[in-house]
Design a protein with these regions (language model features):
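Hydrophobic alpha-helical transmembrane segments of membrane proteins
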Residues: 1-85, 95-256
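Short helix-to-coil transition segments within interhelical loops
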Residues: 90-94
Length: 256
C-alpha cells in the first residue's frame, strides 16, 4: 500500500504543471462569464448562485473534471517518465499496484479540483456582490441587503450535490469518485481498439452514477425498483472486468 501511494505521489508531481494550467483556464473562464453577467444592469440582486446556474458552469465544471482526470492519467505515460529512465515495464511494483497508483492519482486530482472550485467560488462572491450592490445603488438609491456567502453556497446547484449533508450522500460520492478514478485509469492505460469497449463501459457507469445522484434522497427506491439495483450491479461488474483488463494490459506490456 505504501508503494502504491509513493508511486501515486510521483505521478501527481509529474502532472502538477498541466493540472495547474488547466485549473487556471477553468478559473479564468468562470470569472469572465460570471462577472460579465453580474455587470449587466438587470443582474442586480440575483446573486452568485443564479449567475453560476445561468452561465451553465456546472457543465463547464464537469468538462474540466474529465479533463483533470485525463491530464492526471497522461502524466503516467512512458513519455513523461523518459527523463528518469523508467517505463511501465521497469517501474517497481506489480501491475495491480501500478494501475492502483494511477487511479489514486486521478482521484486525488479530482478531489483537489472540487476543492478548488469551492475556493474560487468564495473568491468570486465578493466582486459579484460588490457589482450587484453598485447596481442596486444606481437603481434604488440605496444598497439593499444581499444574500450572504453561506446562502449562495447552499443555493448553488453544484455544491448541493458535492457537499454531503447525509451519510448516504457521502457514501455515494466516495463510490462515484472511486468508480470514476478506476474507469478513467483503465481508459488511460489500454491502447488501440481496447479503448472503445472501456470508453463504452465508462459511459454506462457514468449514466448509472447520474441516476444514483438523482434518486439519492429516495434510496428506498432501490428496493422498490429492481431496475436500479440491476444497473448498479451491472456497473460494478463492468468496472471489475475493466480493471482486470487494464491490469492484464500492463502485465502483457500493452499499456500506454
Amino acid at each position: 500500500m505504501q508503494h502504491t501511494f509513493t508511486l501515486a505521489a510521483w505521478n501527481f508531481r509529474l502532472a502538477r504543471r498541466s493540472l495547474l494550467a488547466l485549473w487556471g483556464v477553468f478559473a479564468a473562464q468562470q470569472a469572465a462569464v460570471i462577472l460579465w453577467r453580474a455587470a449587466q444592469p438587470g443582474a442586480a440582486g440575483l446573486g452568485l448562485a443564479s449567475h453560476y446556474y445561468a452561465t451553465m458552469q456546472i457543465f463547464a465544471w464537469l468538462g474540466f473534471y474529465l479533463l483533470t482526470a485525463l491530464a492526471a492519467g497522461a502524466a503516467t505515460h512512458n513519455s513523461r517518465r523518459a527523463r528518469s529512465g523508467y517505463t511501465w515495464a521497469t517501474l517497481p511494483g506489480t501491475p495491480g499496484q501500478k494501475l492502483a497508483a494511477k487511479a489514486v492519482t486521478i482521484a486525488a486530482a479530482e478531489l483537489v479540483f472540487a476543492a478548488w472550485q469551492l475556493v474560487w467560488y468564495i473568491v468570486e462572491f465578493y466582486p459579484v456582490t460588490a457589482l450587484e450592490g453598485w447596481h442596486r445603488r444606481q437603481l434604488y438609491g440605496a444598497v439593499l441587503p444581499a444574500a450572504n456567502l453561506y446562502e449562495q453556497v447552499v443555493a448553488n446547484n453544484l455544491f448541493a450535490r458535492l457537499l454531503p449533508r447525509r451519510p448516504a450522500q457521502l457514501v455515494i460520492l466516495l463510490g462515484i469518485l472511486a468508480l470514476s478514478a478506476a474507469m478513467l485509469a483503465a481508459l488511460d492505460t489500454v491502447r488501440g481498439w481496447r479503448k472503445l469497449p472501456v470508453f463504452a463501459g465508462g459511459l454506462f457507469c457514468a449514466w448509472v452514477c447520474f441516476g444514483i445522484v438523482g434518486i439519492e434522497q429516495h434510496l428506498e427506491w432501490l428496493l422498490d425498483e429492481p431496475r436500479y439495483a440491476f444497473r448498479i450491479a451491472a456497473a460494478a461488474v463492468l468496472a471489475v472486468l475493466t480493471v482486470w483488463w487494464a491490469v492484464r494490459s500492463i502485465r502483457r506490456g500493452e499499456a500506454a
